[in-house]
Amino acid sequence: MMAPFLLWFDLFRAMGQRGMWLSILAVSGGAVIGANLRWALGLWLNSSDHGISYGTLAANLSGGWLVGLLIGYFAQGGSFSPEWRLFAITGLCGALTTFSTFSLEVVSAMQEGKWSMAVAGILAHVIGSIFMTVLGIYTFGVLKG
């Protein structure tokens, strides 16, 4: 098995060092924005009064919608440079959406015996995110006219 750093080395060499650094910068820049948006949503929407983390749900649903909007744009022939795609989809949307926090919240609900809340969380996040991605694609079609 090849060591992970050797895979990175081969990737750098294949893309050319300049292209790789631009890609890393694009993903990193988008991730900084996406992670801060997710954090802000949590501060704004989460409270200790209820067991549902509305900030996490809002992050996943809005990220799904944004990915759908971007995919709709690309499917209609819209073009961004590869670096802008990495910034928007991999960086921003990838850091905005959060499978790990969602998973932790579901497992915590299960451990507390709140099975209906766990199932509701799974349905809201998974079905909701898929629905919002489809809605994002549809939204782009409506906006494009």
Predicted regions and their residues:
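Membrane-interface helix-loop junctions in multi-pass transporters/channels
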Residues: 2-145
